[in-house]
Amino acid sequence: MAETVWSTDTGEAVYRSRDPVRNLRLRVHLQRITSSNFLHYQPAAELGKDLIDLATFRPQPTASGHRPEEDEEEEIVIGWQEKLFSQFEVDLYQNETACQSPLDYQYRQEILKLENSGGKKNRRIFTYTDSDRYTNLEEHCQRMTTAASEVPSFLVERMANVRRRRQDRRGMEGGILKSRIVTWEPSEEFVRNNHVINTPLQTMHIMADLGPYKKLGYKKYEHVLCTLKVDSNGVITVKPDFTGLKGPYRIETEGEKQELWKYTIDNVSPHAQPEEEERERRVFKDLYGRHKEYLSSLVGTDFEMTVPGALRLFVNGEVVSAQGYEYDNLYVHFFVELPTAHWSSPAFQQLSGVTQTCTTKSLAMDKVAHFSYPFTFEAFFLHEDESSDALPEWPVLYCEVLSLDFWQRYRVEGYGAVVLPATPGSHTLTVSTWRPVELGTVAELRRFFIGGSLELEDLSYVRIPGSFKGERLSRFGLRTETTGTVTFRLHCLQQSRAFMESSSLQKRMRSVLDRLEGFSQQSSIHNVLEAFRRARRRMQEARESLPQDLVSPSGTLVS
């Protein structure tokens, strides 16, 4: 006989099912390994030989009417949350004084019915359901040392049996929440109790009583064969995994007489009928088809293209954070300025925004306010003027950082500006800010006590104002001081017909502006050729209207 291959992987496996968990069925086979077990396989392996059947040498039935082999091997099919009583529970609940809870009395009634109907169907294999007061200490008790002889203390065992439960309570519609959604000053106990998401679980343990023959019903001989956990999302956790094609699991008992047991766990849940599977397949196909049609109706069938020579700029941005400012409770006012030449935006487009007020948090040596405020906008660039050799201007993002205190006093903390990236992709930009200041102590006292300070009338003065027409801009006499920084995260998308042109014989242009300039050159050449055709057509019409005697008959005039 070949050597038995044991399965040593006792880790848990996770499954997901959309079917009701009540349909779950497991077949558990338990057998004690003895020398006679191996001999019983010999006749089947050597059929056709003149051998004596080993059944002759098997032990005879005992006085109780059961052979020892039947007690050493058991196979049973168990359903989800099906209660199978152990011999210890049968002996315990037969005594009415041991019953303390309604569940104990219910178990007592069930055990009495089983005794009247001929006894329970299981011998060594039994279960602990989600309602039972049982906790696997090996799973919940964390060892403090690496010693194999470490035993959990009495307090650890009692605390492991305290099971956390969370009822799925759904509030009434329109009801008022009694608890606060945000706790501004959490205590250490609050953080310790709420930092873990506690998902409601239903647990079931499949156990085995591996005590000696006719000495069942002792807690010290109980061993966990399999643990099943199911949550409300249909996630099923099995530890250890189903046997399948792997070898059986093994258990070695401790004590004076060590014994070796093997067991297998198989999923024998009933399969759906072909008609039910086909009906479910049609339902899901119809559902997915309707969802696909809904998404298609949102997207549309026509892909929106830009006009030739135009660039569409789409920006998904985020005001990430601000740090390094004097006062707390910050908020940011920002807007995008489009250059007057070549740039435009839809009429409904909003190019400005204001973040929420955010309290700063100490991070290293700085106080940081995390906004995570999203914004989006789009703009169009149309390159038409070829006479100008200057590079086209790009949109500019301006920001103004302000603080607001408890008395509704606001202060300007800084101004800043940054040019939007000219390349598509994700960009993280840090904008340094400054603010105008006044000399003297009175200005600082006014800023501290009543708020308010010098402000810019035009925020575009941070760079070059749009109303400026000269060659040089002087800021002489403006006193400023450097303040903090604002971090932006921008995801830029660019769309243009120029991106559709690709040729292996031509080198890739350096930027989209080069491609747009090529479109303008092609348009200029097209305009010249069209003007030449119109002039030639007018010349031919003029010749046809001339008298014939003015035209040379000898053909000297050749068009």
Curated annotation (Swiss-Prot):
Alphabetic keyword roster: Bardet-Biedl syndrome, Cell projection, Ciliopathy, Cilium, Cilium biogenesis/degradation, Cytoplasm, Cytoskeleton, Disease variant, Intellectual disability, Joubert syndrome, Meckel syndrome, Obesity
Gene Ontology biological process terms, A to Z: branching morphogenesis of an epithelial tube; cardiac septum morphogenesis; cilium assembly; common bile duct development; determination of left/right symmetry; embryonic brain development; embryonic digit morphogenesis; embryonic skeletal system development
Pfam families membership: B9-C2
Domain (C2 B9-type): residue spans on this chain: 311-439
Subcellular location: Cytoplasm, Cytoskeleton, Cilium basal body; Cytoplasm, Cytoskeleton, Microtubule organizing center, Centrosome
InterPro entries named among the record's database cross-references: C2_B9-type_dom
GO cellular component: centriole; centrosome; ciliary basal body; cytoplasm; cytosol; membrane; MKS complex; nucleolus
Effect of residue 80 to C: Found in a patient with Joubert syndrome also carrying a deletion in MKS1 intron 15 and a missense mutation in TCTN3 gene 'P-95'; uncertain significance
Domain of life per record: Eukaryota
Result after altering residue 166 to W: In MKS1; uncertain significance
Binding partners and assembly: Part of the tectonic-like complex (also named B9 complex). Interacts with TMEM107. Interacts with TCTN3, AHI1, TCTN1, TCTN2, CC2D2A. Interacts with FLNA. Interacts with TMEM67. Interacts with B9D1 and B9D2.
Function: Component of the tectonic-like complex, a complex localized at the transition zone of primary cilia and acting as a barrier that prevents diffusion of transmembrane proteins between the cilia and plasma membranes. Involved in centrosome migration to the apical cell surface during early ciliogenesis. Required for ciliary structure and function, including a role in regulating length and appropriate number through modulating centrosome duplication. Required for cell branching morphology.
Disorder named in the UniProt entry: Meckel syndrome 1: A disorder characterized by a combination of renal cysts and variably associated features including developmental anomalies of the central nervous system (typically encephalocele), hepatic ductal dysplasia and cysts, and polydactyly. Bardet-Biedl syndrome 13: A syndrome characterized by usually severe pigmentary retinopathy, early-onset obesity, polydactyly, hypogenitalism, renal malformation and intellectual disability. Secondary features include diabetes mellitus, hypertension and congenital heart disease. Bardet-Biedl syndrome inheritance is autosomal recessive, but three mutated alleles (two at one locus, and a third at a second locus) may be required for clinical manifestation of some forms of the disease.
Name by which UniProt lists this protein: Tectonic-like complex member MKS1
Organism field: Homo sapiens (Human)
